[in-house]
Amino acid sequence: MGHFTEEDKATITSLWGKVNVEDAGGETLGRLLVVYPWTQRFFDSFGNLSSASAIMGNPKVKAHGKKVLTSLGGAIKNLDDLKGTFAQLSELHCDKLHVDPENFRLLGNVLVTVLAIHFGKEFTPEVQASWQKMVAGVASALSSRYH
């Protein structure tokens, strides 16, 4: 999972303060569902997921994406205890929803892509390195309840 340096924490927190959680969340989850279509099976109740435009415009996708990134915002405040922060969500996704833990890694990588698109030149290789470490840590924490 890796240890977060003070520089990592500052880099992650600084960029996070500029993220529009609603826009980035909807785009991140939407892209996950388009790029990795097998993930759609966890979102049967979301209605029309028949095409990229249907997915990207789907209000339930946008709302859940916002919820996901809001949860991530809580983790950013607790980078030294990601496992504790995500204990309940890990249990839910493992025991009740049966989500493949690999999907957490995929979602993290899609988020990094979205941040790169949104922030352009500001999303330097150093910023990306800190964010990759963070999304890997979150994916690991969310996978911690799996047997």
UniProtKB/Swiss-Prot annotation:
Expression across tissues: Red blood cells.
Alphabetical list of Pfam families matching this protein: Globin
A single Gene Ontology CC term: hemoglobin complex
Family annotation (PROSITE patterns): GLOBIN
GO terms for MF: haptoglobin binding; heme binding; hemoglobin alpha binding; metal ion binding; organic acid binding; oxygen binding; oxygen carrier activity; peroxidase activity
Tree of life domain: Eukaryota
GO biological processes: hydrogen peroxide catabolic process
Binding positions (heme b): 64, 93
S-nitrosocysteine found at: 94
Keywords: Acetylation, Heme, Iron, Metal-binding, Oxygen transport, Phosphoprotein, S-nitrosylation, Transport
Domain Globin, residue spans: 3-147
Modified residues (Phosphoserine): 45, 51, 53, 140
InterPro entries in alphabetical order: Globin, Globin-like_sf, Globin/Proto, Hemoglobin_b, Hemoglobin_oxygen_transport
Post-translational modification N-acetylglycine, affected residues: 2
UniProt modified residues of type N6-acetyllysine: 60, 83
PTM sites of type Phosphothreonine: 13
Quaternary structure and interacting proteins, as annotated: Heterotetramer of two alpha chains and two gamma chains in fetal hemoglobin (Hb F).
Biological role: Gamma chains make up the fetal hemoglobin F, in combination with alpha chains.
Family: Belongs to the globin family.
Name used for this protein in its record: Hemoglobin subunit gamma-1
Organism: Hylobates lar (Lar gibbon)
